[in-house]
Design a protein with these regions (language model features):
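Surface-exposed interaction/ligand-binding surfaces
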Residues: 1-345
């Protein structure tokens, strides 16, 4: 049979960054058998020099991440930060609460976490990937490995000074310690790993919630954000006892799920059913983005020509910090007498 052979040559380069920043190392290129081939490029992030290392460390390791020695873990080597994207908001204005782990320890495990109940807020959690992604970060002169533990979008439900209470975490850290036992030195390289239990608490966060301005429109929906509204009707020509459907679509970003349904004033002669609501939204840092679809179903019982007035939709525009009112079109429907008893339900 055919025999093939392959060979490879590896080139290794050792680089040292002169300055902090994000860099892209372009792909290397070679020409083999007349064809040019290019390898992939590599992106790297270089942190500033660590100011929290041990004095015994030399300059070559000053950019790496090291925990302090000993049998304890300091609050500077491991902590969890709770941060709000905004601390001065309006009622119902969305903001993001992030819990982020900062560590200089390489071996840690989260045993238990107790988060506050977010009293005074409506909360929705942002979905995270199942596996934590640790990234290096320079914070207050020291280098850490960090990961986002959990994130929530919060909507304050009342004005005044509200507080996000501390979250409580219980963690276990595996820390290597040197042993003076000659047997340990021979069999284990002179080091053992001890487990250290550590309780961590995040600070309380104050959120200043401003009331919505005075002068709310009579038809204020409770919406806070940026929205549009549109309407459609299934038919303007129908017979008695046929269903008529008007669909309203409120689109935009904000507290979409918390917006009250606009009222359609159907003629008194129509039998009106409860509206059907479909929230097609996704969670973003600004709130819920997408569409709130409301379908209104009514049945005319008598023939005639009827006017269905458009709806008025008022909300608080977070960008202009003012109330805005949007209106949909009126509909005129022609109802003819259908077969059978028009009075039948």
């Amino acid at each position: 049979g055919n025999v093939t052979s392959t060979s490879s040559i590896t080139f290794t380069y050792i680089l040292m960054a002169n300055n902090a920043g994000e860099y892209t190392i372009p792909g290397a290129s070679i020409v083999a058998d007349g064809d040019q081939m290019v390898s992939n490029s590599v992106k790297i992030k270089v942190l500033p020099q660590d100011q929290g290392g041990n004095s015994g460390q030399n300059n070559s390791s000053s950019g790496s991440i090291h925990s302090s020695s000993g049998t304890s873990v300091s609050n500077q080597d491991l902590f969890i930060m709770a941060s709000a994207s905004k601390t001065n908001v309006y009622e119902q204005e969305a903001f993001v609460l992030t819990y982020k782990i900062y560590t200089r320890e390489s071996n840690l495990q989260l045993n238990n976490a107790k988060l506050p109940d977010f009293k005074g807020f409506h909360s929705q959690e942002i979905e995270m990937t199942t596996n934590a992604r640790w990234t290096p970060e320079h914070y207050q002169g020291r280098n850490y490995y960090t990961t986002v533990y959990r994130q929530f979008v919060l909507f304050p439900q009342q004005s005044g000074k509200l507080y996000i209470d501390p979250a409580q975490f219980q963690m276990t850290i595996g820390k290597p310690v040197q042993s003076d036992d000659p047997f340990d030195a021979f069999f284990n390289g002179g080091s053992n790993v001890i487990e250290i239990k550590k309780n961590i608490s995040t600070p309380k966060i104050a959120i200043n919630v401003n009331p919505l301005p005075t002068g709310k429109p009579a038809d204020f929906s409770g919406g806070v954000g940026e929205f549009n509204i549109s309407s459609s009707i299934n038919s303007k020509e129908l017979k008695t006892n046929d269903a008529i459907t008007i669909k309203l679509v409120i689109s935009g970003t904000g507290n979409l799920k918390l917006i009250s349904n606009p009222e359609i004033k159907f003629p008194d002669d129509f039998e009106v059913y409860d509206p059907k609501v479909d929230n097609q939204v996704r969670l973003t840092r600004e709130g819920l983005t997408g569409n709130k679809i409301i379908e209104y179903l009514a049945i005319p019982r008598h023939a005639g020509t009827y006017k269905i007035p458009g709806v008025s939709f008022s909300y608080f525009d977070i960008r202009s910090k003012s109330y805005k009112t949007l209106k949909t079109e009126d509909y005129v429907v022609n109802v003819e007498k259908g077969a059978g008893n028009a009075e039948q339900v």
